[in-house]
Structure formats: C-alpha cells, structure tokens
C-alpha cells in the first residue's frame, strides 16, 4: 500500500539480484533449418531440448550451453530475414548472447546499440577485430579441440557465454575450468592479449582454463575507467542499473508526487537495496550511498532560467524539478581475488 510497498520492492530486488546472478539467462542464435524446429524456443535444461529438431552440430552446441547450468537458454534460428532475430532479441530477457549463426559484426553492433539505450545485455564473440566495448567479450583462441572433436572459436563462444551467464556475482570467471578442452593453440603473449581486451584460454598441470576474465574494452575514459574492463564488475553495474530502473518504473513513475520528501523516500529505498548487495557485489567496507544530486538539481534549475547563485544548497535540494528526479551514488564494487603477492621472511 503506497510508499511502504515501493520500499519493499527495492528490498525484494536485492534478494532477487543475488538469486538471479547465480544462474542467468543465455540466448543462442543458430543456423539450423531442421524440419519441424521452432524459430524461437526456451529451455530450462538439456533434457527439455528435442534433439530430433536440431542438426548434430547444433545439438552439440546446446549441450555446451547447458554445461554450466544457466537458468534458461533461449534458442533462435537465423533465417533469411536477419532482422527478425534481432527483433526477438530486443524483447527476450536474456543476460548473455552467443550467436554463431550471425556475423560477429552484427552482434557487436546490436549489443552496442542496446547498451546505448540503457539495456545491460552482453555477448561473447570470437577473434573479432577490436570490439572495444564493455558489453562484448572477445574470445580469442585457435586450433581448439574438445573431447568430442575440433570446434571453431565462434561455436565455442556458446560454451563461454553459458558459463558467464551461470556464474554468480560472487565469483569471477578468471581461471574457470574448461574440462572439455583437450588442446588449443597457446597464446604467444598472454599478458599482451589480456591488455588488448582478449579473453584467452590458458593451460596448466590441471587442464585448460579461461585466462583473466576481461571484456574487450580497451579505450579508457573518465567515465569508463579500468574497472569497466572486468567482466565481474560490469555484471554488478548492469545488475544494479536494471534493478533500480525496474523498481522505479513499476513503483514510482506516474504514481508518486515529485517533492523533496518523496525523493528522500526513493533515496532511502535505493540505499536499502545497495546495502543488500554489500559483501558480494559492493565492497562492504566502503560507504555505498545514494543521495539527491545537488549538481543535477542546480543544472536543471539553471536550464529553466532560475538563478541559483544566491540559493543555499538546502534550497536547491528542496527545489521543485518538475517530473525530473536527480540522484547520484558513490559505489565501490567488489572484485574477486585474482592476483597474489606474498613476501616471505626467513
């Protein structure tokens, strides 16, 4: 009933966020014209997949998709009309995309467009030429052989995307085990490849694993600094953005008067949500806090012709801003342990 219910929505979102991050949704686009196969389907497990409706190659990829147990896999078939696939992807609630049935350039363009519109979807492509995007993971590997035979990198992107979709936000994909890999070409310079935004496969005494879990972002700016290159950090950023936007749209838009008191109630709700993410997504030792944005309020007032030079900060914060809500948050995300330096004295 009213605002208390909205507050509960935000707290529920915190619980939902951690649950959802345990097993995310994967979308797979295949080139498969098997008679009787649906153009679009969703499966919760490999047991639900009708093997007879797919080619042997497609079914092999779907087995890889389910290896890490994502919550669900949306399967689409790329036909002559490629726009139909992208229209479907625009409405499907997936987290990660792998599309061996489409050109990587099309996938990269789609993901960049979706992210520019505020949707936190991501994709895994293979051996692409510098996607340079925090939403694109560029799997770079060659001469890949699995237990059941050779496979090209674009097809194996399905396995990696499924792994990333299933991975909880408490973990990084760095050194994630790839038990099905028998061999692959070794990177000539792993450090250089990682710095170039490439996700590589490395080998050790215990088998093959993913290298450092980075996305393809290489051009750093003040708005997108080094943390944006880490897959784990971007998962947290996208999750928080989506959960808060969803709660605001369902509980506030058109329903709550936009005065200062209600802005504070919204801030309180957001802070309660952020508190629930500390320790797994956010650094619990940091002051992760949202507040009404003084600069946002001031800039809006100035754009409306109001001279704020003689206004007190409290007056600016309390000022009427029409339908606009300006908030700001200072967040510190929690990465996973990946590097160790141990000094031993004897």
Residue ranges and their predicted role:
Residues 23-25, 93-95, 120-121, 186, ...:
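Short, surface-exposed beta-edge/turn micro-motifs
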Residues 163-223:
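Extended, charged amphipathic alpha-helical segments
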Residues 1-58, 171, 202-346:
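Structured, hydrophobic secondary-structure cores that serve as assembly/anchoring elements
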Residues 58-175:
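Extracellular Cys-Trp
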Residues 26-28, 115, 176, 181, ...:
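Generic alpha-helical propensity signal that fires on short helical segments
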Residues 12-17, 58-65, 84-85, 186-188, ...:
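Intrinsically disordered, low-complexity boundary segments flanking structured domains
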